[in-house]
Amino acid sequence: MNSCQQKAMEKLLHGHGCANQLLIMDQTESDSSMEREDLAKSVLHCFSDALSILIDTNDHQDDQSNNSSPQDSSPVLESSRKPLHKRGRKTSMAESSDYHRHESSTPIYHDGFLWRKYGQKQIKESEYQRSYYKCAYTKDQNCEAKKQVQKIQHNPPLYSTTYFGQHICQLHQAYATFPIDTSDFEEHEGSHMIRFGHPNISFSSSTSNLRQHQNHQDRIKDEYMKPVIAEDWSPSQWMSSEVALAVEAFEFNPFWTSHDLSS
């Protein structure tokens, strides 16, 4: 027991003694009203002093905890900060308004873009792993487009492909809209597109609209992605710088005909 607690205890004991004396006077029917008043005041003062001591002691302990050194509190602060920071990284991509989610009966790997897988992990409350991809031109052309692929249902099979960001790489500048893989839409007409963050653009789940969209993209490919003559072809226009150097070293042109190769 520290000194403050000892003082408070002494005050309480003294007040308790005064209260007992006051009780005895009531039982003996003493006529000394002045003595009764003094004892009652003593009881109140003792209790007030004891309460003041206890309150001051509690306030002093709170001040010490608030003024503790950063070294003493750093483990607690770090442990409380890290989960918040980690949650921020996990939700930053999901909270982005510029993303599209597509569900289909088979995973979409060939969607008209070049991707590089950079991770795969098990997701909580899901028995299927999620794969993470980023644009193959992230370093060469600072394209930050990403996508996630995950199986979400076994029977019937259902896969979710989520796209984040927009492609800015030159290879895909011809694509003005979000690419859709319609290879299995003939057999699975229940596949549908969900798009967020662009209220002025809507995608219908009907097969006819999807076929029209695919035909539109085919025309874009024919117009923008094929050179008119073989001599106009340059590897640096269609692939990363490392691959382009290798192709140029072998003097290879994919648009040469058999006549060009034999001459």
Curated annotation (Swiss-Prot):
Keyword Protein biosynthesis part of the UniProt annotation: no
Any one Gene Ontology cellular component term annotated for this protein: nucleus
Organism for this UniProt entry: Arabidopsis thaliana
Family: Belongs to the WRKY group III family.
Descriptive protein name: Probable WRKY transcription factor 62
Induction, as annotated: By salicylic acid.
DNA-binding region of this protein: 104-174
Transmembrane segments: none
